[in-house]
Amino acid sequence: MAVEPPRRGDVWWIAFDPSVGSEIRKTRPAVIVSNDAANEVLRRLQVIPLTSNTDRLYPGEAIVQLNGSPRKAMADQLTTASKERLRERVGRLSNGDMIAIERAMRVQLGL
């Protein structure tokens, strides 16, 4: 049986180690933000890591709901990850949450 490619808006556990300096580290959930056409053919994708620490919110961040729990999407940690780093699909974000992430990305990247 063929495995369906990761899709924009999916949340996967991703192994970010090894990391350097202040890069995101450890295995944590991240939302896929790259487009589905690229996700089907490339061996890498763009992701935004999520954290359960929602105490402080910066302009380049967004609060989203993952399986009923609040998470902070950190657009300042937007990164490209090999599909080999993907461990397990944990859910999918709502359209509203993806709009909030897109807004955070625009702020972070000055678009």
Language-model segments: residues:
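Conserved functional hotspots at enzyme active or ligand-binding sites that engage polyanionic ligands
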Residues: M1-L111
